[in-house]
């Protein structure tokens, strides 16, 4: 069992303890340690208040001081240190109206979402498990701490997180937890779409995504999400892990729609990837020659092309025609990419200025068209990417 990340953080806990306070590892890192999984992020919980943490350590960042969280910078690493706290009544099913700092570990752990995430551990690797989290982990069960209805009423995102954990861990959901989700799923309409998208992104990449996605449908979760609410998501099938962006593109192609993505509040990069995925899926079935393959690899991000090809079963499950494997496969994609004479228009040895001077013509719509013709000629091997050769080819093949 790799304890290196815990050992790297140990001096922080020891320094807090040396000042008379309690300190424990908590949350996902402890859960993953119990499961024998790789540890990623270390979270620390303590009886010390934020002010007391700031007085103990010389380099701190008050990232969420009002909620009890201080970042302690130690050996060039950031560690979240959060004070034991009890939360007051929640507002809009998503955030507490306030927090009260407490000195009792049990009181802090009982406010957490699921039993598997409510285990604390000290520097001697002793576990503090008041809610049978280890037993649920051993039985591969996701169960809320306390009454499920209350946990989901406090923060409706916990329902989506539950399905995300199910997808990632291949756990079952406790019956009472699932039934509470069935009756309260409509409350996710109060959440910001940004928080939902973060969870969906992780859910879609989970090894058990098929079951979790089917639960999203059966629990009618999509009915309460912007963008998805206008679609019949029961017609969409996901059989293996894919990017959320690819899912959205599959939805667009399946229903032949061009709905605005603005309600999802995605990044520009995500929107760009979705649009490329759509174009890739629409282009794939028609690629039957090597020249078409060259232009396809040139025009689109090969990582996205590969993602679509690897997801062939998902496309098939949604009645979307895939690629011709003899022409388009992972090997031919890599070989074609390696042999391309150039990878974007910036590599081309002529530009608009050179063309206008050579043809003694003013700028106009013709210019974009001619540059594209040259691009195609170079990529498909009809002319070498040298200025003199390109201009000869233009003289022989282009009319404006």
Swiss-Prot record:
CTP binds at residues 28, 31, 112, 155, 158, 161, 164. The lineage of its organism: Bacteria, Bacillati, Bacillota, Bacilli, Bacillales. Gene3D superfamilies: 1.10.246.80, Beta Polymerase, domain 2, cca-adding enzyme, domain 2. It is an enzyme of class 2 (transferase). Catalyzes the addition and repair of the essential 3'-terminal CCA sequence in tRNAs without using a nucleic acid template. Adds these three nucleotides in the order of C, C, and A to the tRNA nucleotide-73, using CTP and ATP as substrates and producing inorganic pyrophosphate. tRNA 3'-terminal CCA addition is required both for tRNA processing and repair. Also involved in tRNA surveillance by mediating tandem CCA addition to generate a CCACCA at the 3' terminus of unstable tRNAs. While stable tRNAs receive only 3'-terminal CCA, unstable tRNAs are marked with CCACCA and rapidly degraded. Homodimer. This is CCA-adding enzyme. GO terms for biological process: RNA repair; tRNA 3'-terminal CCA addition. Belongs to the tRNA nucleotidyltransferase/poly(A) polymerase family. Bacterial CCA-adding enzyme type 3 subfamily. A single active site specifically recognizes both ATP and CTP and is responsible for their addition.
């Amino acid at each position: 069992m790799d304890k290196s990340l815990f050992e790297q953080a140990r001096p922080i806990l020891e320094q807090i303890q040396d000042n008379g306070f309690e300190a424990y590892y908590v949350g996902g890192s402890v859960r993953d340690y119990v499961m024998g999984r790789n540890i990623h992020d270390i979270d620390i919980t303590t009886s010390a208040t934020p002010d007391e943490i700031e007085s103990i350590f010389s380099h701190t960042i008050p990232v969420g001081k009002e909620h009890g969280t201080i970042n302690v910078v130690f050996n060039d690493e950031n560690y979240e240190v959060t004070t034991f706290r009890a939360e007051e009544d929640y507002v809009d099913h998503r955030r507490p109206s306030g927090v009260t700092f407490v000195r009792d570990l049990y009181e802090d752990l009982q406010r957490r979402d699921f039993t598997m995430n409510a285990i604390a551990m000290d520097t001697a690797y002793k576990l503090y498990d008041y809610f049978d989290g280890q037993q649920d982990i051993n039985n591969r069960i996701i169960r809320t701490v306390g009454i499920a209805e209350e946990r989901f009423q406090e923060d409706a995102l916990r329902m989506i997180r539950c399905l995300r954990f199910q997808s990632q861990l291949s756990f079952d959901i406790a019956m009472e937890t699932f039934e509470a989700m069935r009756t309260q799923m409509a409350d996710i309409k109060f959440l910001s779409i940004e928080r939902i998208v973060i969870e969906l992104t992780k859910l879609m990449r989970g090894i058990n995504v098929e079951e979790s996605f089917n639960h999203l449908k059966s629990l009618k979760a999509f009915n309460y999400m912007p963008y998805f609410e206008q679609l019949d998501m029961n017609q969409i099938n996901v059989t293996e892990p894919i990017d959320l962006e690819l899912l959205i593109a599959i939805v667009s192609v399946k229903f032949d729609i061009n709905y605005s993505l603005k309600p999802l509040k995605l990044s520009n990069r995500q929107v760009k990837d979705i649009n490329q995925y759509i174009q890739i899926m629409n282009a794939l079935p028609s690629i039957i020659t090597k020249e078409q393959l060259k232009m396809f690899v040139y025009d689109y991000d090969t990582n996205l092309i590969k993602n679509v090809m690897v997801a062939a079963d998902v496309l098939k499950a949604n009645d979307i025609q895939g690629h011709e494997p003899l022409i388009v496969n992972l090997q031919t994609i890599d070989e074609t990419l390696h042999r391309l004479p150039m990878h974007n228009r910036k590599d081309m040895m002529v530009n608009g200025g050179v063309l206008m001077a050579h043809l003694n013509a003013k700028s106009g719509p013709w210019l974009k068209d001619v540059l594209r013709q040259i691009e195609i000629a170079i990529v498909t091997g009809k002319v070498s990417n040298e200025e003199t050769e390109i201009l000869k080819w233009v003289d022989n093949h282009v009319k404006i």
